[in-house]
Amino acid sequence: MSETSRIDGRRLDQLRDVRIERGWLSQAEGSVLVSFGRTTVLCNASVTEGVPRWRKGSGLGWVTAEYEMLPRATNERSGRESRKGKVGGRTHEISRLVGRSLRAVVDDKALGENTIILDCDVLQADGGTRTASITGAYVALIDAVNWLRGRGGLVSEPIIGSVQAISVGVVDGIPMLDLAYKEDSRADTDMNVVMSGNGDFVEIQGTAEGTPFNRNLLNELLDLAAGGCATLKQAQSEALGVTL
């Protein structure tokens, strides 16, 4: 595989086209439609006064997330989990990942006893749905915090940084950035990397689907991810009209 022989002709270190559109739903305190290529996720932030029972009286806020895919987001229809009566393991895992990633850049005390829930609904899936969800949900979170600030509902500034996420992997022995589904399904190594805007790692999820990877290859993948996250940070900044 050459540097120009990826499925869509991208370079090995090149993201798919990234689009971040704010204000997608008028009812939500924050609403963002984010696209990584053909992968499209609607991220809505909802603010409620109060916190879960186990957190009441602490003076701390709570940020959490729920992730789900529309039945026909993929090539074949998948049944609605609500009809099955339980949330699937993958859905639960990704919901927790999105929530953890956002909480990494939130000062719970400054948020006060308010809850912000991020709903990430995948409209179309072509690889990287969890990383697109994190990247888009952060922008929706910022809009929700700004809404709360405008209502006088904040103790102080709760956002202490930015967060981005991207996938990397090894396909046919070659490391590459931002895998589309057809690449991801053939990957020897698949990794999702969440980073803060200052370049620190929030979470790394990596698996050798085939051949194990060594430390040098891991470093190469992390370097690819760092470059991708820096580009995503710029896209978030442009969408918000501020410098993150």
Swiss-Prot record:
PROSITE patterns in the cross-refs: RIBONUCLEASE_PH
Gene Ontology MF terms in the entry: 3'-5'-RNA exonuclease activity; tRNA binding; tRNA nucleotidyltransferase activity
GO BP terms: rRNA catabolic process; rRNA processing; tRNA processing
Residues that, per the record, bind phosphate: R90, G128, T129, R130
Pfam families: RNase_PH, RNase_PH_C
CDD domains documented for this protein: RNase_PH_bact
Record's function text: Phosphorolytic 3'-5' exoribonuclease that plays an important role in tRNA 3'-end maturation. Removes nucleotide residues following the 3'-CCA terminus of tRNAs; can also add nucleotides to the ends of RNA molecules by using nucleoside diphosphates as substrates, but this may not be physiologically important. Probably plays a role in initiation of 16S rRNA degradation (leading to ribosome degradation) during starvation.
Annotated PANTHER family: EXOSOME COMPLEX COMPONENT (PTHR11953), EXOSOME COMPLEX COMPONENT RRP41 (PTHR11953:SF0)
Protein name: Ribonuclease PH
